[in-house]
């Protein structure tokens, strides 16, 4: 069972604190303990309209153990990995818009590379956690556009489907499509200067913005893009 929503918590369980209100986040996978539709008692509660999953935990002696838990069928989950399409990438990305940015997982939130990693993990695609490692993917997947002019980059990106990955040193984002000739991206952003402004803002949000926003050095994100990563 794959979590395809941004996050949710399991129901409170008065008999098993290790799974009570446990938070599950996008891309997490849990094995099914029983076939979907199975009805049985789990710690005194019948499993109607729930998936029964195995949650890995640590036993008192330090060994691995699994605890059965119930996941309501109303939660945003998928049996098995989602089919990989770029439309599905955008659908998943949209579920994170407006959430707080958290560098390295601070504030129980995502930074730019964690966001991209978790979205793609829903398809069974395991990307590197760090931006620097992501940029080192083989040429088969990562096209180097660092030597192109700004307009050539714009045309190259315009030819790509929304959902591909764009990156430059220190930041990674998902191409979100275009509004006319304006390129848009979705990312967990820390800071940038808005279009037609030189003043850097503390953004700290997952949002859709123009690739014409600027870094502190004055470069636009479009000018800074070095790699286009396309899977499939």
Please annotate each region the language model reported.
Residues 1-15, 141-152:
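Short, structured beta-strand/loop micro-motifs enriched in basic residues and often containing a Trp
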Residues 128-196:
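...with weaker cross-activation on analogous glycine-rich loops/strands in unrelated enzymes
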Residues 4-5, 33, 54-56:
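A structural detector for beta-sheet-dominated domains
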Residues 27, 115-116, 173:
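Short alpha-helical segments in extracytoplasmic peptidoglycan/chitin-binding modules
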Residues 27, 98, 162-163:
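Glycine-centered loop/turn motifs
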Residues 13-44:
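Conserved beta-strand/loop element in small beta-rich adapter and peptidoglycan-binding domains
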Residues 1, 59-62, 68, 77-79, ...:
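Aromatic- and glycine-rich peptidoglycan recognition patches
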Residues 38-145, 169, 186:
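N-terminal capping segments
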């Amino acid at each position: 069972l794959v979590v395809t929503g941004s996050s949710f918590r399991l129901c409170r369980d008065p008999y098993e604190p290790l799974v009570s209100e446990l938070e599950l986040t996008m891309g997490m996978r849990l094995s099914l303990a029983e076939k979907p539709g199975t009805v049985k008692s789990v710690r005194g509660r019948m499993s109607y309209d729930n998936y029964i999953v195995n949650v890995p935990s640590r036993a008192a002696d330090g060994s691995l153990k699994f605890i059965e838990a119930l996941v309501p069928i109303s939660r945003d989950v998928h049996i098995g990995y989602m089919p990989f399409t770029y439309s599905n990438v955008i659908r998943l990305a949209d579920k994170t818009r407006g959430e707080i940015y958290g560098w390295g997982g601070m504030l129980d939130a995502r930074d730019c590379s964690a966001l991209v990693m978790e979205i793609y993990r829903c398809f069974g695609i395991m990307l590197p956690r760090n931006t620097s490692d992501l940029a080192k993917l083989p040429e088969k997947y990562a096209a180097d556009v660092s030597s192109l002019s700004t307009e050539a980059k714009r045309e190259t990106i315009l030819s790509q489907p929304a959902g591909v990955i764009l990156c430059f040193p220190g930041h990674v984002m998902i191409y979100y499509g275009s509004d006319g000739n304006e390129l848009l991206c979705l990312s967990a952003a820390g800071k940038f200067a808005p279009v037609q402004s030189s003043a850097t803002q503390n953004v700290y949000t997952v949002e859709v913005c123009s690739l014409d926003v600027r870094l502190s050095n004055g470069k636009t994100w479009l000018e800074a893009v070095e790699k286009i990563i396309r899977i499939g």
